[in-house]
Amino acid sequence: MITSRQLRAARALAGLDQRALAKASRLSLPTIQRMEASDGVVRGNVESLMKLIAALDRIGIELINEEAASTSGGRGVRLKGPAGPRAKRA
């Protein structure tokens, strides 16, 4: 599951506005706006959520759930490591 705070943070980390994220995920701008305005866990149909998560993955954003190993715990987002799509190849 992804929270609205994670979604906003992921979008900011990727340097995208809502319109660009909507285009990248093939969702409507109002859908992205509703998802970001959700309280807590993002609400939406499964297909829309899968499109959103896939788009973030392609962009190079990793979603971190609350069960992930971490010294401080909690949900979050981060840029993917060198194996991600933005990696420079020699």
Regions found by a protein language model. Give the residues of each.
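Residues in the recognition helix of alpha-helical DNA-binding motifs
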Residues: A10, A24, M35
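A detector for short, charged/polar N-terminal pre-domain segments
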Residues: M1-I2
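DNA major-groove recognition helix of helix-turn-helix/homeodomain DNA-binding modules
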Residues: R26, V46-L63
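Recognition helix of helix-turn-helix/homeodomain-like DNA-binding domains
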Residues: L27-G44
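Residue-level "edge-of-site" marker
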Residues: A24, N45, A69
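Short basic helix-loop element that most often maps to the first helix and adjoining turn
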Residues: L7-A20, G81, A87
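Short, charged recognition helix plus adjacent turn
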Residues: D57-A90
